[in-house]
């Protein structure tokens, strides 16, 4: 079985902030760590999207793991679907003759609700291997002051996007759901060229 990519996206609904490509640059694992800094009780609504892509057959995803301050956090699987893409239309030259005929993708969408009342850590991950857990990116978020800080820890393609893109709302949200009225002019942070911590307002 050849897996080309396992990936994760996290959407913080009320914060209007998304974390894209939360998977390792090398290796079949995905995840991220959120450090939330608040001073009063807050309910944090999140959508978490996990995807696995293969060129040979549909590959099942392991269930999402989530923790809040070290304790298990409930996740609700709200949607799961498979897609198949015909790649033969791209095999138009000798350069592309080794391209596989089809690409298979499995997508799972989870709803996650966390009740927090102080500084808290939320972890999402697709494996329990210590080798991968130490390599996940860390994002510090202060919802009250509307700022976040990215700490790059191994995933060179991870991005934070705010506000959430309309294209993502249309893909993952039902009509009339909580993203209505949000614009599509995002501020995009790409941490691919830096290993330094960076502060951003949103």
Curated annotation (Swiss-Prot):
GO terms for biological process: viral process. It comes from the Viruses. InterPro entries: Poxvirus_C7/F8A. It holds the Pfam family Pox_C7_F8A. Belongs to the poxviridae C7 protein family. Plays a role for multiplication of the virus in different cell types. This is Probable host range protein 2-2. The lineage of its organism: Viruses, Varidnaviria, Bamfordvirae, Nucleocytoviricota, Pokkesviricetes.
């Amino acid at each position: 079985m050849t897996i080309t990519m396992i990936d994760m996206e996290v959407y913080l609904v009320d914060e209007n902030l998304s974390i894209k490509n939360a998977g390792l640059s090398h290796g079949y694992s995905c995840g991220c760590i959120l450090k939330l800094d608040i001073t009063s009780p807050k309910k944090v609504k999140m959508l978490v999207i996990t995807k696995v892509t293969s060129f040979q057959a549909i590959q099942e995803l392991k269930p999402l793991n989530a923790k809040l301050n070290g304790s298990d956090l409930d996740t609700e699987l709200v949607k799961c679907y498979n897609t198949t893409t015909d790649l033969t239309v791209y095999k138009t030259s000798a350069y592309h003759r080794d391209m596989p005929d089809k690409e298979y993708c499995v997508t799972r969408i989870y709803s996650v609700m966390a009740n927090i009342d102080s500084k808290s850590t939320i972890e999402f991950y697709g494996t329990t291997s210590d080798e991968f857990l130490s390599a996940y990116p860390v994002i510090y978020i202060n919802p009250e002051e509307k700022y976040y800080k990215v700490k790059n820890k191994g995933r060179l393609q991870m991005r934070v996007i705010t506000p959430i893109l309309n294209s993502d709302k249309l893909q993952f949200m039902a009509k009339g759901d909580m993203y209505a009225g949000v614009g599509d002019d995002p501020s995009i942070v790409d941490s691919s060229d830096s290993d330094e911590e960076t502060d951003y307002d949103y």
